[in-house]
Amino acid sequence: MGCCGCGSCGCSGGCGGGCGGGCGGGCGSCTTCRCYRVGCCSSCCPCCRGCCGGCCSTPVICCCRRTCSSCGCGCGKGCCQQKSCCQKQCCC
């Protein structure tokens, strides 16, 4: 959606619309990533899956790590966490 979830992946504009067509290159070197708006997923924020399912339908805090496991706090599988779900920023 022209929106970048991870500012250090080649998009200086961050999630404010300066990303154009997305980051493209992925987010391998990033440790944290935030989807600021609904539908703000791109290849720069591959964490928007699991209990969120595809591109985020609700604003979430994401983890960019490839492998994730349940954090054991009711979030279910995957690494997308509702803001009200866990105290931790990332569960993986």
From Swiss-Prot:
Q: Could you tell me which residues belong to the region 11 X 2 AA repeats of CG?
A: 4-72
Q: What GO cellular component term, any one, is given?
A: intermediate filament
Is 4Fe-4S given among the entry's keywords? no
Record keywords, A-Z: Keratin, Repeat
At the top level of its lineage, which domain of life is listed?
Eukaryota
Q: What does this protein do?
A: In the hair cortex, hair keratin intermediate filaments are embedded in an interfilamentous matrix, consisting of hair keratin-associated proteins (KRTAP), which are essential for the formation of a rigid and resistant hair shaft through their extensive disulfide bond cross-linking with abundant cysteine residues of hair keratins. The matrix proteins include the high-sulfur and high-glycine-tyrosine keratins.
Q: Which family does it belong to?
A: Belongs to the KRTAP type 28 family.
Q: What else is known?
A: Human have a similar number of genes as other primates despite the relative hairlessness of humans.
Know the name of this protein? Answer: Small cysteine and glycine repeat-containing protein 9
Q: Native species of this protein?
A: Homo sapiens (Human)
Taxonomy of the source species: Eukaryota, Metazoa, Chordata, Craniata, Vertebrata
